[in-house]
């Protein structure tokens, strides 16, 4: 839809941001909307919290469309900390603690690792897993606990595809935040690294070749719509240390799991280092730390502050930071519209018709039972905010649903 309005949007946005006396000068200069004066800085270097250049746009409650873009520019909120940082590493490496501390020091928004609770616990707090006794086996819940205890189950393929979808959805939310507020984000894992788990599961025989094919087709159909991160931080631990950490944090289903064998953990390490980190480093900056004995977030922040992200702007053919190199303000606005206003369209790219993998297909009879049970559960009959039996009020005066609700 945005393409229809592109010409008019470019003219209107440019007219609102350009001075007539500078038109000639700008023909010889790069009108990049996202030019930085310095590198990322932490609170210690700044001497206090980040001061926004402009008030954040309320993207969670207010739509951002072509018409909003005419009056509300995107790049005016950007500063040196308007970045996407992804924290990666093996299981039990200490990513959550580190990512939280990093986000706090850099004054960025923290996005924790996703899990299936985002699907199984609805907006009213009801756990849909309670419905399992009423559902046929193909429609029952299957989350990380189930995977750890029974990794060869037919629903393992669906589990990993759902994890990728959740990471994809969360990454879109993170892009919404950066483009609408100017505040950077720190994510624990990302859709770009999700494939290492799928490949490790396939190598260990937990996924069929057909399920792997479906996953790869879904990934190929969706991943190109996102903007790659500016920085990836990898916390490295050898396999023996990972196993010790899993035992130390004492999560029952992890300790009892047959999944976290030397072979599976070695596959994860190999896939991370030989494929993911190698590929993502062509675009993003990469920092790798030996986290066997933990580490200090302050040291990492100092290393981040030394990175000159602006050095790649001079060469327009350099692949580094290429996804974030938009020369026109209108292009920034279009990217923001894409992630803020058109998220449902992006999620629809997962609708790839593949019916040749039995474990990813449920029968019509099972599907009917699932619909009848699922959508009669507490809080599931109508959209959130419209369920009178759950205490929602003012139904007669409500005329619209929330932004991104139900996605």
From Swiss-Prot:
Complex I is composed of 45 different subunits. This a component of the hydrophobic protein fraction. Forms a complex including sicily, ND-42 and Hsp83; the complex is necessary to chaperone ND-42 in the cytoplasm before mitochondrial import; the interaction between sicily and ND-42 is direct and occurs preferably between the unprocessed forms in the cytoplasm. Pfam families: dNK (PF01712). It comes from the Eukaryota. CDD domains: NDUO42 (cd02030). Accessory subunit of the mitochondrial membrane respiratory chain NADH dehydrogenase (Complex I), that is believed not to be involved in catalysis. Complex I functions in the transfer of electrons from NADH to the respiratory chain. The immediate electron acceptor for the enzyme is believed to be ubiquinone. This is NADH dehydrogenase [ubiquinone] 1 alpha subcomplex subunit 10, mitochondrial. It is found in: Mitochondrion matrix; Cytoplasm. GO terms for cellular component: cytoplasm; mitochondrial inner membrane; mitochondrial matrix; mitochondrion; respiratory chain complex I. Belongs to the complex I NDUFA10 subunit family. One of its GO terms (biological process) is mitochondrial electron transport, NADH to ubiquinone. Keywords: Cytoplasm, Electron transport, FAD, Flavoprotein, Mitochondrion, Respiratory chain, Transit peptide, Transport. Disruption phenotype: RNAi-mediated knockdown leads to loss of ND-30 and reduced mitochondrial membrane respiratory chain NADH dehydrogenase (Complex I) activity. Larvae exhibit elevated reactive oxygen species (ROS) and an up-regulation of Hsp60. RNAi-mediated knockdown in the eye results in retinal degeneration exacerbated with aging and accompanied by high levels of ROS and accumulation of lipid droplets in the glia. RNAi-mediated knockdown in neurons results in lipid droplet accumulation and increased levels of peroxidated lipids. Its main location: mitochondrion. Residues 1-60 form a transit peptide. PANTHER family: DEOXYNUCLEOSIDE KINASE (PTHR10513), NADH DEHYDROGENASE [UBIQUINONE] 1 ALPHA SUBCOMPLEX SUBUNIT 10, MITOCHONDRIAL (PTHR10513:SF15). SUPFAM superfamilies: P-loop containing nucleoside triphosphate hydrolases.
